[in-house]
């Protein structure tokens, strides 16, 4: 009887240990990264990370939100005219870069299904972006190539071009 009770207690302790570890792992996985952390984790957005840091917008994109980010891919930055990216990353152009990046951000969490119902939406920068869902999903002249990347403080849609406001 004593051996059975010892085995029972050992099995119960092991079961509780595994259940606790499983619950902890599940809780950890359910916590999403914020917009900035999600962008940093995506290898197709490294140029955007560099631009966000140069404009010192990390804290904004880590903020409470919610925000919708139309994130230009690395390939999108390559499409800029020669020298443009280098000029924008220059510290003297920080305000211009910040204006361009905030033109890619909309206040509120807007899933793709919500965005395509609109004709335009106001950006954090202050100007509107035009939405065209007649042939795919476009904002201004950029095609949305990946949608609805959920974050703890909003959502990200990846686009194939950098969109430029009138500045």
Walk through the language-model features, giving the residues of each.
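Bacterial N-terminal signal peptides
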Residues: 10-20
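Mature, structured domains of secreted/extracytosolic soluble proteins
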Residues: 3-6, 21-167
């Amino acid at each position: 009887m004593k051996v059975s009770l010892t085995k029972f207690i050992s099995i119960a302790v092991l079961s509780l240990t595994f259940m606790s570890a499983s619950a902890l792992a599940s809780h950890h996985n359910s916590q999403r990264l914020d917009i900035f952390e999600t962008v940093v984790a995506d290898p197709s957005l490294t140029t955007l990370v560099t631009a966000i840091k140069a404009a010192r917008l990390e804290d904004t994109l880590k903020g409470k939100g919610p925000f919708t980010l139309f994130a230009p891919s690395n390939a999108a930055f390559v499409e800029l005219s020669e020298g443009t990216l280098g000029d924008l990353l220059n510290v003297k152009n920080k305000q211009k870069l910040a204006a361009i990046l905030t033109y890619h951000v909309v206040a509120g969490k807007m899933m793709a299904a919500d965005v395509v119902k609109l004709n335009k939406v106001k950006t954090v920068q202050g100007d509107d972006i035009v939405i065209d869902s007649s042939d795919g999903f476009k904002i201004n002249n950029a095609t949305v190539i990946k949608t609805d990347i959920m974050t703890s403080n909003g959502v990200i849609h990846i686009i194939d071009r950098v969109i430029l406001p009138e500045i």
